[in-house]
Amino acid sequence: HLELTRDIANRFNGIYGDVFTIPEAYIGKSTAKIMSLQDPTRKMSKSDENPNASILLMDDPDTIIRKFKRAVTDSDMEIRYSDDKPGIQNLINIYSCITGKTIEEVEKEFDGKGYGEFKLAVGECVANRLKPLQDRFYELQKDKTYLNSVIKENDEKAAYFANKTLRKVQKKVGLTERIR
């Protein structure tokens, strides 16, 4: 969707002048791509047919840990970051990102330990990181009055900015006389 938005904005701006701000994607360096837990050569996707391939933000801790325990890895047992070990490489990237440890620190921490212990640690780490977000989500879900007030407030803000942009677009394309 971002690329389509960028294309439309660039095309419109090219014809009518600068009207739209071109959106830029934010991609963190360490998590530019989190790979599938079941096929580490493919990007993790919530729409993957295999429910064990991805971690959803609202997965409960047991589900998260179970998915990491089932993550595809090679038959070697050495926890080492290497392109020929995409499954372990993916898990190391995830653990490194969540803990803030370097890849070398992760390798050292799990030196001499097996994949089972490492997968459990990654699962627990991710589950613990998601817990505050999940707790806040469930807390907000209980307060329907607050949620409705936020929706109303932001609906009004969105309408204001959308109308402002629409008037700008109408003026640029010469529709100001016909549309009020």
Can you annotate each of these PLM segments?
Residues 2-180:
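Conserved nucleotide- and phosphate/pyrophosphate-binding catalytic cores
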